[in-house]
Swiss-Prot record:
The gene is ndhG. The keyword Transport applies. This is NAD(P)H-quinone oxidoreductase subunit 6, chloroplastic. Belongs to the complex I subunit 6 family. Its EC number is 7.1.1.-. NDH shuttles electrons from NAD(P)H:plastoquinone, via FMN and iron-sulfur (Fe-S) centers, to quinones in the photosynthetic chain and possibly in a chloroplast respiratory chain. The immediate electron acceptor for the enzyme in this species is believed to be plastoquinone. Couples the redox reaction to proton translocation, and thus conserves the redox energy in a proton gradient. NDH is composed of at least 16 different subunits, 5 of which are encoded in the nucleus. The chain crosses the membrane at residues 10-30, 32-52, 61-81, 92-112, 152-172. It is a multi-pass membrane protein.
Length: 176
């Protein structure tokens, strides 16, 4: 999508602030329903990030799969659980919460100070062969596969890591 510079920048700032507010809502809200709705906001903002980079199919797939299926499943699971068990033993801060908060804050501060100082122009994420340029001989499914394995490799891997962490968290919660 070819947007003028100020509109593109405003869109990125708007979606980024939606991501930050939704992420804070997921972590800080004590009601699990509100937290699940905040997760839905985060997933919608992530899917909308793909639209300015002209990957409408990935945005639609992200929206359908994560918001339409996963988040609705999480909301149904939270609604079927007993809500009183969340509030019985509610302590404001424990030692583990403090250590986790300190660790996450230090990682966040180190990333905020490191990322702007890094020269990203020398980093080559992927290499494309000359065969990919000839797109007339390639079907749409193959083009999606090529784009997922070259142009969108990093977001695809980050999504797979997020799914792995969610799966491990679900297994840990089910064992308790």
């Amino acid at each position: 999508m070819d947007l003028p510079g100020p509109i593109h920048d405003f869109l990125l700032v708007f979606l980024g602030s939606g991501l930050i507010l939704g992420g804070l809502g997921v972590v800080l809200l004590t009601n699990p329903i509100y937290s699940a709705f905040s997760l839905g906001l985060v997933l919608v903002c992530i899917s909308l990030f793909y639209i300015p980079s002209n990957s409408h199919f990935v945005a639609a797939a992200q929206l359908l799969i994560y918001v339409g299926a996963i988040n609705v499943l999480i909301i149904f699971a939270v609604m079927f659980m007993n809500g009183s068990e969340y509030y019985n033993d509610f302590h404001l801060w424990t030692v583990g919460d403090g250590v986790t908060s300190l660790l996450c804050t230090s990682i966040f501060v180190s990333l905020i100070t490191t990322i702007p100082d890094t020269s990203w122009y020398g980093v080559i994420w992927t290499t494309r062969s000359n065969q990919i340029i000839e797109q007339d001989l390639i079907s749409n499914g193959q083009q999606i596969g090529i784009h997922l394995s070259t142009d969108f490799f990093l977001p695809f891997e980050l999504i797979s890591i997020i799914l792995l962490v969610a799966l491990i968290g679900a297994i840990a919660m089910a064992r308790q």
